[in-house]
């Protein structure tokens, strides 16, 4: 039943160098969290300054899927925000000018499903990744995958 997936890997991220050929810098979750929450005022101000420099083209920034997943987890578990608020904040991050985000389309679908289906973000990302790559079957014991149209959860025997 297992099928080979020749193109299941994501293509390399398009990391565009700045005009002076410098490489982009990775932005960690805490920078986004300070920016989004405003707590630790000095750090929040510094985070905003960094993101504004990127918006003006003075900095080239990148972030990863795992960073976005960490942001979702912290906003949910530490800040106890509702899913709608978390979705709005993640969409704002994904739309920041000057920031390249790994698998941005997949993340956008995942955060929509996170709010709509009340499924944990990691499962939403996996379902969105599957859809993006044309996969339909997932081996899992997790019943949450039953909520995704077009996916067939398989229970190993």
Q: Where are each of the predicted segments found?
A:
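Acidic, metal-associated active-site segment
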Residues: 120-137
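Structured helix-beta-strand junction loops
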Residues: 57-58, 96, 117, 148
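Short loop/helix-cap segments at secondary-structure boundaries that form the rim of catalytic
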Residues: 144-151
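Short active-site oxyanion
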Residues: 57-61, 98, 134-136
């Amino acid at each position: 039943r297992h099928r080979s997936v020749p193109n299941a890997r994501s293509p390399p991220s398009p990391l565009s160098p700045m005009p002076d050929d410098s490489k982009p810098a990775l932005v960690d979750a805490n920078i986004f969290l300070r920016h989004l929450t405003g707590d630790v005022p000095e750090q929040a101000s510094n985070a905003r300054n960094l993101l504004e420099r990127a918006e003006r083209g003075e900095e080239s920034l990148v972030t990863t899927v795992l960073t976005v997943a960490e942001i979702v987890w912290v906003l949910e578990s530490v800040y106890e925000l509702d899913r709608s608020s978390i979705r709005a904040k993640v969409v704002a991050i994904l739309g920041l000018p000057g920031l390249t985000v790994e698998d941005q389309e997949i993340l956008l679908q995942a955060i929509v499903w996170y709010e709509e289906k009340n499924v944990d973000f990691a499962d939403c990302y996996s379902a969105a990744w599957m859809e993006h790559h044309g996969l339909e079957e997932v081996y899992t014991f997790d019943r949450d995958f039953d909520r995704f149209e077009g996916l067939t959860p398989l229970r190993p025997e």
